Amino acid sequence: MKRVGILNSTISEMVANMGHTDMLAIVDMGFPIPDGAKKVDLVVDKGKPGLLEVVEVILKELEVEKIILAEEMNEKNPETRDLLINLVGKNNSNVKIEFVPHEEFKKISRTSKGFVRTGADRPYSNVILVSGVIF
């Protein structure tokens, strides 16, 4: 049995298969995941698990060069935005942050290698992690 890192086998596999510039979408419980997309639904209750705790574990294994957020998060959910940016910055202070309109975010997410649905229940609690390289 695996002891450390991502213990969910499907998420672990998705991260292991990521290449440079591949994307992984970590989304809230209401986000529309496209039919046929690879997804892991972690929701056990409203708010559980939260976006930040899921992202924190994934960042232990995934090299991230950029994150994409909905620009609506700036007005509707600045607290989560700030906590998320600080969390990502702890792992890599050079991570680029891109804000796009929510409708554009949904379009971009369709090209993600996978989706991880969290129990996040705050508006626009979604992030796309863009994979970097380790060399």
Swiss-Prot record:
Reaction catalyzed: beta-D-ribopyranose = beta-D-ribofuranose
CC terms in the record's Gene Ontology section: cytosol
EC number: 5.4.99.62
Key words, A-Z: Carbohydrate metabolism, Cytoplasm, Isomerase
Subcellular compartments: Cytoplasm
UniProt-listed Pfam families: RbsD_FucU
Residues bound to substrate: D28, H102, Y124, S125, N126
Pathway in which this enzyme or protein is active: Carbohydrate metabolism; D-ribose degradation; D-ribose 5-phosphate from beta-D-ribopyranose: step 1/2
InterPro entries: D-ribose_pyranase, RbsD-like_sf, RbsD_FucU
Any GO BP annotation: D-ribose catabolic process
Keyword Cytoplasm recorded: yes
Family: Belongs to the RbsD / FucU family. RbsD subfamily.
Main function: Catalyzes the interconversion of beta-pyran and beta-furan forms of D-ribose.
Quaternary state and interactors: Homodecamer.
Protein name: D-ribose pyranase
Gene that encodes the chain: rbsD
